[in-house]
C-alpha cells in the first residue's frame, strides 16, 4: 500500500457533535479550509450513539439549539417541552446540511496523534485512514460526555446474554419480555428503567448511590407557546447568555430562608409540579446549591416525595439518597412510580455488592444469582477529559497532554492550554457549567475571536499568528474555578463525574467553572476580543 501524501488544511476539527458543528459554522465565512473528522459513522456525537430507550434532553426544547440562526429558531419544528434523542439528531443533521457543513466531514475516522511542529508552526495530525494532515489550527470538539465508563465486573465475558452500555445501545436490541438488569441510576439509568419497565418480563435495578430525580413535566407545547418563543427569542437569548446556568428562565435572587416555612413548602410544591431538575435548583431560590442548611431542607422534601410515591417501604428505602442535592439534577417522567410495578425490583449494592457475572446472570456477595437475559450498563462516562487523554497530543517541547494533566485537567477559559499553541478545545475542562449548547457557543466564540486575531496578524505581517495561553493565565483560571466551586455544594460530592470521582484512579479536582455562564462569557469575550489578556503576544 502506497503511503498517503501529507495534506495541508487551515483548520482541523476532531468531533462532529454540537461542538464541532458549531465551530465549523462560526468559521465558515473566514476563508479558511476546514477538515472535520469523527470516529462515528455520522455527525451527532453523543446524540448519535445514545439511542437507548427513553433518551432525551434535560433542557427545554426552545433553548436546546444554536442561537445564531434566528430564521431557523423560528421555523424549525419542535412540539414537546423536551426533545427526544431522534429529534436532537435530526436537528443537528438539519443544521449542518442547511449551512453546508457536511462537505468538510469524514466519518469512521479516528485521530491517532496530533504533534506540534515548532519549525513550521503547524500541527501534524495522523488519522486512522493512514493520512497525515498539517494544520495551522487544531480544534478538539470531542464532547464532555462521550467516552463510556465501562465497569470492571469479574467474568463479564462469560455472560451468555446481551451486555449493552447505554451510550452504545445495539440497534437491534429488543428487551420485550426479557429479564433485564440495569446497573446504575444516573440520567441514562433513570430514563431507560422508566421506559422499558412496562414491556420487560422483569427488571432488576442494581443501585449503589441513589440519586434525586424530579418530574420533567414533559408535555406537548401549544401554538401560543411557540408564538411566544418566536416573538421573544432576542430577549430570551440575551437573558440566557447573561444568566447563571443558561436554561432559558429567570433565576431567582431570593434566599431560601428569607421565606417563611409554609411559603417555602408551597414554592417547592410548585417547582415539583411545574418545573424540572434545573428549574427546581434555581428558579424560586438562589442558594439551594450554596447553603447547606437550605439544601438539607430540600433533601427532606424530596425524600418525603419518594416515600409518598413508592408504595413498598423497602423499595422506597433503597431509592432514598442520603447525600446532598448537589449533582446535575435528573428529570424523569414516572421513575419512582415505576417501582410500584410488580416486575421491578431493586438490589442495594452497598448491602449486596456485585461479586461476578455468571453465564446466566449476575451474582451478588450475599450468594443470590439474579438471572438475566440482558444486562444494561448505565454507568455513565469518563467525563470531560476522557477522550482528550486517550490519544497522543504533543505540544511544545514534546509535552504530552496526558502527562501535563496527570494531576487533573487544566485550561484557560476551558478553551486554551498553555504549552499547546494553536490548539483549542470546544467546551473543554474548566468550561462553563450549565446548558451545554450556550456553553459550547461561548467557547466557540472565544476560539473564533482568537483565530480572527491570528489571521489578522498573518495578513499584516506575513507570519503565522500563534495563539497560546500563558502558564500564569492557566494557573489563575484554575484558581478562579476552584474558588467558584468552593461556594457550590457540587464540589462536596467526591464520587461525581464533575470531580472525576466516578472513575477509579482518576485525579480528583474541579472540572467546570461554576461562576455562571454570563460571567464566563464576559471574561472570555474580553480576553479574546478586546484585551488579549492571558495570551502570549503575537510576533
Q: Language-model segments: which ranges?
A:
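Rossmann-like NAD(P)H-binding beta-loop-alpha module
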Residues: 178-200
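Active-site glycine-rich loop that binds ribose-phosphate moieties when present
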Residues: 166-168
Amino acid at each position: 500500500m502506497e503511503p498517503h501524501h501529507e495534506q495541508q488544511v487551515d483548520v482541523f476539527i476532531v468531533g462532529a457533535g454540537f461542538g464541532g458543528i458549531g465551530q465549523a459554522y462560526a468559521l465558515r465565512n473566514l476563508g479558511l479550509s476546514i477538515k472535520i473528522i469523527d470516529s462515528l459513522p455520522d455527525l451527532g456525537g453523543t446524540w448519535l450513539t445514545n439511542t437507548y430507550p427513553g433518551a432525551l434532553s434535560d433542557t427545554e426544547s426552545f433553548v436546546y439549539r444554536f442561537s445564531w440562526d434566528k430564521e431557523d429558531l423560528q421555523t424549525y419544528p419542535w412540539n414537546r417541552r423536551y426533545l427526544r434523542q431522534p429529534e436532537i439528531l435530526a436537528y443537528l443533521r438539519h443544521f449542518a446540511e442547511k449551512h453546508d457543513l457536511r462537505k468538510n466531514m469524514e466519518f469512521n475516522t479516528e485521530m491517532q496523534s496530533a504533534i506540534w511542529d515548532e519549525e513550521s508552526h503547524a500541527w501534524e495530525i495522523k488519522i486512522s485512514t493512514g493520512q497525515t494532515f498539517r494544520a495551522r489550527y487544531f480544534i478538539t470538539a470531542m464532547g464532555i460526555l462521550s467516552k463510556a465508563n465501562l465497569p470492571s465486573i469479574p467474568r463479564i465475558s462469560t455472560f451468555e446474554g446481551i451486555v449493552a452500555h447505554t451510550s452504545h445501545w445495539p440497534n437491534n436490541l429488543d428487551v420485550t419480555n426479557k429479564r433485564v438488569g440495569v446497573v446504575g441510576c444516573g440520567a441514562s439509568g433513570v430514563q431507560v428503567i422508566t421506559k422499558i419497565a412496562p414491556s420487560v418480563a422483569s427488571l432488576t435495578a442494581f443501585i449503589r448511590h441513589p440519586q434525586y430525580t424530579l418530574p420533567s413535566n414533559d408535555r406537548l407545547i401549544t401554538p401560543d407557546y411557540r408564538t411566544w418563543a418566536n416573538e421573544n427569542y432576542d430577549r430570551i437569548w440575551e437573558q440566557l447568555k447573561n444568566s447563571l446556568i443558561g436554561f432559558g428562565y429567570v433565576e431567582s435572587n431570593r434566599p431560601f430562608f428569607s421565606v417563611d416555612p409554609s411559603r417555602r413548602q408551597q414554592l417547592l410544591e410548585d417547582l415539583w409540579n411545574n418545573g424540572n431538575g434545573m428549574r427546581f435548583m434555581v428558579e424560586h431560590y438562589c442558594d439551594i446549591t450554596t447553603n447547606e442548611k437550605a439544601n438539607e431542607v430540600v433533601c427532606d422534601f424530596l425524600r418525603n416525595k419518594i416515600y409518598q410515591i413508592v408504595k413498598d417501604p423497602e423499595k422506597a428505602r433503597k431509592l432514598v439518597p442520603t447525600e446532598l442535592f448537589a449533582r446535575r439534577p435528573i428529570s424523569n417522567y414516572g421513575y419512582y412510580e415505576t417501582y410500584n410495578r410488580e416486575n421491578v425490583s431493586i438490589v442495594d449494592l452497598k448491602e449486596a455488592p456485585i461479586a461476578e457475572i455468571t453465564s446466566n446472570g449476575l451474582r451478588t456477595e450475599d450468594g443470590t444469582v439474579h438471572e438475566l437475559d440482558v444486562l444494561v450498563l448505565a454507568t455513565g462516562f469518563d467525563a470531560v477529559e476522557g477522550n482528550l487523554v486517550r490519544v497522543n497530543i504533543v505540544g511544545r517541547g514534546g509535552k504530552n497532554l496526558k502527562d501535563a494533566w496527570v494531576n487533573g485537567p487544566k485550561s484557560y477559559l476551558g478553551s486554551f492550554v498553555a504549552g499547546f499553541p494553536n490548539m483549542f478545545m470546544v467546551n473543554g475542562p474548566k468550561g462553563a457549567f450549565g446548558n451545554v449548547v450556550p456553553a459550547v457557543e461561548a467557547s466557540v466564540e472565544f476560539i473564533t475571536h482568537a483565530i480572527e486575531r491570528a489571521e489578522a496578524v498573518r495578513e499584516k505581517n506575513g507570519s503565522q499568528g500563534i495563539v497560546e495561553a500563558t502558564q500564569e493565565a492557566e494557573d489563575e483560571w484554575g484558581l478562579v474555578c476552584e474558588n467558584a466551586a468552593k461556594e457550590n455544594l457540587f464540589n462536596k460530592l467526591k464520587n461525581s463525574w464533575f470531580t472525576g470521582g466516578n472513575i477509579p484512579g482518576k485525579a480528583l479536582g474541579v472540572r467546570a467553572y461554576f461562576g455562571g455562564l454570563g460571567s464566563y462569557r464576559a471574561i472570555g469575550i474580553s480576553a479574546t476580543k478586546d484585551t488579549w489578556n492571558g495570551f502570549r503576544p503575537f510576533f
